[in-house]
Amino acid sequence: VAELKSREQDIDELNQQIVQYAAMSLTHDANLQSGEYVKIASDLERLGDHATNIMERLLLIHDSKHDLSEEALEELATMSRLALEILDQLKETVGDNLEEVNNQEQLIDQAYETFERMQIQRLKSKVCGTSNSVHFAKILTDFERLGDHCLNIAQEMNTIHPSWKFVEQQD
């Protein structure tokens, strides 16, 4: 917990430094590129925010007297795995990996929608209570937004380096 909070502070400080550096760019092309770096820095900072939110909500669930169902725990494990995979893909974003980030983000969106529906069904059938359902739903949302920010970063990197291959997100 302390390590995650420390890293979040580091990310916030780096974000501020990147924005300051990008604002100092002089040429028109450099200004366009620095704008993309500012967007990337902002998305990276948001990744840290969502990771912190997930940690805090998991601690609230852990500290409560009500556990999540086995299914809900498995769903959170799946979302965690998907999030780690997209982060790994983002770290190695070159060439065709940009398309992989897009595909992974779509998997996260699909899992989010499925798991949200399943949680509603569990609530309706009283398999689980409302105590931690709100936290569960917010954790799902944080994972989904984490995927969105990873895709944003990949797209912004593609703008900076257009020679990289990337398939635009299909709606």
Task: Enumerate the predicted regions with their spans.
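Cytosolic, long alpha-helical scaffolding segments
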Residues: 1-171
